Design a protein with these regions (language model features):
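Extracellular/oxidizing-compartment recognition motifs
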Residues: 1-266
Length: 266
């Protein structure tokens, strides 16, 4: 729900864990309603820092939710995450802040967050302890997609690589459209600068892979972007793409705090 990205954000989780609130009235329907969430390591347990350590704040991803219902007669009721919830593997088979995201469409479960869903290998969840005293409502601006920048050109480097150029450096992700068949792969490697000869330069990324990858499960046209990562980039190396890539197939989406603009430079 909502337009916020990369929630709950990066904080010192043992001292402050931010939560977000949303009005979900418009999503409710008569009869049985369902809710679900997709989780990734993020800053909490993903690879972070100069030492590339993992599990800096904990070794278990988790999700908690309270649904507060206000009835027309003025009474209220709360529904919480509890042992009755179930979980299963998602199509996001890999997600790291530094290294990117890998998505396998063959693992998709149609309508996975609806109450009537019966497909998928759902298993009981495991309850974990977390000190709720450190939970705080998010008071700062939330991260959102703030600009959409079409690719300016696709070109061949002197070394023969195919590269997308968005004509400005940014923090964000790439939205890609492609037509493929089962097993086809879209793979892009994001980077910031070309070397002095005009070739792909990756040394400043150190060990970060900054790669987004999508594998088709069926013959179709898809528009996809990663959800649990972001990159700093102006360019993207096309490692794999079904068909001939065209500039109109790629859009960069900038991600940053949702703040009002006071001016600009030309």
């Amino acid at each position: 729900v909502g337009e916020d990205e990369m929630t709950p954000g990066w904080t010192s989780y043992r001292r402050h864990l931010l939560y977000q609130t949303y009005d979900v009235t418009e999503y409710l329907q008569k009869g049985i309603n369902g809710a679900g969430a997709m989780l990734a390591p993020g800053w909490y347990k993903g690879v972070m820092g100069l030492t590339k350590a993992r599990n800096n704040y904990g070794d278990q991803t988790a999700f908690t939710m309270e649904l507060l219902i206000r009835y027309t007669d003025g009474t209220t009721e709360s529904v919480y995450t509890d042992p009755s919830w179930k979980g299963c593997d998602s199509p996001v088979v890999f997600a790291e802040i530094y290294d990117g995201e890998t998505y396998d469409a063959a693992l998709e479960i149609p309508d996975w967050s609806k109450a009537e869903t019966t497909k998928g290998d759902w298993k009981p969840v495991q309850l974990v302890f977390f000190d709720t005293q450190v939970m705080r409502a998010q008071y700062a601006a939330k991260v959102r997609v703030m600009d959409r920048i079409p690719a300016k050109r696709i070109f061949k480097t002197p070394a023969g690589d195919t590269v997308i150029d968005f004509a400005q450096n940014m923090a964000g992700r790439i939205e890609v459209t492609a037509a493929g068949k089962p097993g086809d792969v879209i793979e892009l490697h994001c980077f910031e600068v070309l070397d002095k000869d005009g070739n792909v330069y990756l040394d400043n990324l150190r060990a970060a892979k900054a790669t987004m990858k999508y594998t088709f499960a069926r013959e179709e046209t898809v528009t996809w972007h990663p959800t649990f990562t972001y990159m700093g980039f102006q360019y993207a190396l096309i490692v794999s793409y079904p068909g001939e890539p065209k500039a109109e197939n790629f859009t960069a989406c900038t991600l940053h705090s949702n703040m009002a603009s006071n001016g600009s430079l030309e």
